[in-house]
Amino acid sequence: MRLKNLTFIIILIISGELYAEEKPCGFPHVENGRIAQYYYTFKSFYFPMSIDKKLSFFCLAGYTTESGRQEEQTTCTTEGWSPEPRCFKKCTKPDLSNGYISDVKLLYKIQENMRYGCASGYKTTGGKDEEVVQCLSDGWSSQPTCRKEHETCLAPELYNGNYSTTQKTFKVKDKVQYECATGYYTAGGKKTEEVECLTYGWSLTPKCTKLKCSSLRLIENGYFHPVKQTYEEGDVVQFFCHENYYLSGSDLIQCYNFGWYPESPVCEGRRNRCPPPPLPINSKIQTHSTTYRHGEIVHIECELNFEIHGSAEIRCEDGKWTEPPKCIEGQEKVACEEPPFIENGAANLHSKIYYNGDKVTYACKSGYLLHGSNEITCNRGKWTLPPECVENNENCKHPPVVMNGAVADGILASYATGSSVEYRCNEYYLLRGSKISRCEQGKWSSPPVCLEPCTVNVDYMNRNNIEMKWKYEGKVLHGDLIDFVCKQGYDLSPLTPLSELSVQCNRGEVKYPLCTRKESKGMCTSPPLIKHGVIISSTVDTYENGSSVEYRCFDHHFLEGSREAYCLDGMWTTPPLCLEPCTLSFTEMEKNNLLLKWDFDNRPHILHGEYIEFICRGDTYPAELYITGSILRMQCDRGQLKYPRCIPRQSTLSYQEPLRT
């Protein structure tokens, strides 16, 4: 009985595995890359894709796949796309002060190593004279830096956060913890962080900043608002499509602490194109294009022994196909004549009479090759075209020359029919077409084309008052976008859309946008002065709209607000405040029977916001009987420090005295 039950369970499990529905893969959104345009246009036709289907994706200029390549394939699996179609920004050669880099590259691919060294008296981030770092998907494995050797570390001013101690100077190997205010994050992207004092400074410089999201690329056939260089956590961007296009995806995306969510949408055409045509059962078509324009016609034929019912033509109209015909099996039995004769070959006859659907095969004599299908079929009284037998004596000479490319494995004197060569393009040239060319009967099939890259011309940029938004390699691949920005003091014409600043490389040519000088309006006069602080930027009589100045407080004063003020439409933004420190009064401490709890609090200045702790002298206790000892911990507030009061134990109070200041 137990064996029966076990067998039944095994059958259930196996049947469950056999009939489990395979989960298809949805439309992939390639971060910093793209797939072929027709997938975007006919998204609903191609997706979801079935298991084991493959899809190629390409990376934008300045980005590579995780394996360091510009193009890669991903496969649909039961777990989704594998590998995940993502493109990562190449690592740029760092601007290294007090050190050197051993090679002359400007950009490094993912998984590529770079060696750097430091000058005398300076150390790498690992405390060594030389170090090797690797380009990873999120940047360098550690940021190449040469830091001066130190014996102590000074805790920097911490805005929007607090240290766990009031101590300011730390010895090597000392550690300190700090916490950031709501909405701000540590240098490591956390709410709290512990840093260590090393010989070259802090392991990670303490700071609290708002997380930022990467800039957004322009979408094809659409635009978004607002456009910024960088976005902070909480920023929302809305997408719009041009006329005759609609959004596929959410029109609103938001910057979170983990990046943008949801992914950017795409703009798809409404009516101008049709997907591949519907194919009735037992039919075939002659063309196999991926897209069809409005008004295009496709001819449909029925398979052998089937008759067409309805129009053999269907038309693309407003994004939809007209009604296709049906192919119905014919009832009439029609015989064919004897199979046709061919030179230098013969048919393999197996009957005297042949009807609809009957087939006959051919073979060639020795020394001849069969050209065409080796099989013909009787179709309603007529044979399909027979093959030809061609003498097999033609070899191919040198393969065709490809400009800016070459045969990968060297060139032979001659090539036999059926052999092939593989082409590769020169560095930065994009291969279009099949990379394989085959020798067939003395002729080569069409070779690929190597499309020229673009070289950005500095003279043209200076002439048009523009500069590159991002750092690129010396060449930009055909089809990739180059983002420009206007130089400071220049702007696009009011009638020119912002999309003109994003230019596509087209076979070595770049159409440079033109920026003109801004009108002189919105200028500011001298920036406002602040109490207990100074302006450390160089000063001028007038300031352009958008320019800024930086402030610094006097020693021991606490800077509150932004340390920079900006000129906006003729007015300065609010400058920072410099809050006064507190001075410890031993006279007040004596009056109130107080002692310092910690020796390190015996200092001339206590910064705004810092705490200082007291204890009562012997045989005294806090005057406020209902309050615990925590009242003896006081905070400096804009130069004012309140002192608690301790009274002798034999005294009694008939009333509660206020705190003295």
Curated annotation (Swiss-Prot):
InterPro entries: ComplSys_Reg/VirEntry_Med, Sushi/SCR/CCP_sf, Sushi_SCR_CCP_dom. One of its GO terms (cellular component) is extracellular region. The keyword Repeat applies. Residues 1-20 form the signal peptide. Residues 24-88, 89-148, 151-210, 211-269, 272-329, 334-391, 394-452, 453-516, 522-580, 581-647 form the Sushi domain. Changing residue 136 to F: In FA13BD; uncertain significance. Pfam families: Sushi (PF00084). The keyword Nucleus does not apply. Keywords: Blood coagulation, Disease variant, Disulfide bond, Glycoprotein, Hemostasis, Repeat, Secreted, Signal, Sushi. Glycans are attached at residues 162, 545. GO terms for biological process: blood coagulation; blood coagulation, fibrin clot formation. SUPFAM superfamilies: Complement control module/SCR domain (SSF57535). It is found in: Secreted. A motif (Cell attachment site) lies at residues 617-619. Disulfide bonds join 25-76, 59-87, 91-135, 118-146, 153-197, 180-208, 213-255, 241-267, 274-316, 302-327, 336-378, 364-389, 396-439, 425-450, 454-505, 486-515, 524-567, 553-578, 582-636, 616-646. Its main location: secreted. Changing residue 25 to R: In FA13BD; may disrupt a disulfide bond; impaired subcellular location leading to accumulation in the endoplasmic reticulum; impaired interaction with F13A1; impaired structure. It is linked to Factor XIII subunit B deficiency: An autosomal recessive hematologic disorder characterized by a life-long bleeding tendency, impaired wound healing and spontaneous abortion in affected women. PANTHER family: COAGULATION FACTOR XIII B CHAIN, COMPLEMENT FACTOR H-RELATED. Tetramer of two A chains (F13A1) and two B (F13B) chains. The B chain of factor XIII is not catalytically active, but is thought to stabilize the A subunits and regulate the rate of transglutaminase formation by thrombin. This is Coagulation factor XIII B chain.
